[in-house]
Amino acid sequence: MNIWNNAVITNKGLALQSKLMEGHSLEITRAIAGSGYVTPDLLQNQTDVIDAQQELIFRPVSYPEYGKCKLPLYLTNEDVTVGYKVRMIYVMANDPDEGEIVFFVAQSARSDMGTIVPTASEMAGYSAEWTFYFQYGRADGVNVTVDPANTVSRNEMETYVGEEFVAISTPEIDSIFES
């Protein structure tokens, strides 16, 4: 099991937070899985992504309580041709003065740990999900663009699952359960 106990808002992220106090909204632009590793004391100084592997998919953001933003991130191995180990997760944000910055970074507890991502041919359909919580005075001011191509509605899922159950309900299978 991987432990992600090294998680910080970077120095540039803290500077952006002070701008949020002036009325700007936090605009999270993307999230990236990386295989790099730094001494935990250096995480707050991160300005670049180390050994980027792939962009993560945003799941719908929610606000479980006032001032708290829940940000789920999702990864699939659909296009992975060389397996790797996720040791760092970067959340990027738009700074009104500097453009895109490393806002937040989380790192596995040790360099030999991480989430293993196999290739699509090794394990088709593999996925992983991480959820991060950010607490602010105005968490409802966080803007994240969620790509609707990566989500399904409850109705769509129920229809799909129902069709799959019908597809596997053949007379041969039914006769096994009747015996």
Language-model-detected regions and their locations in the chain:
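N-terminal assembly/attachment segments of tailed bacteriophage virion structural proteins
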Residues: 1-148, 174-178
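A signal for long, low-complexity, Ser/Thr/Asn-enriched, surface-exposed stalk/shaft
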Residues: 152-179
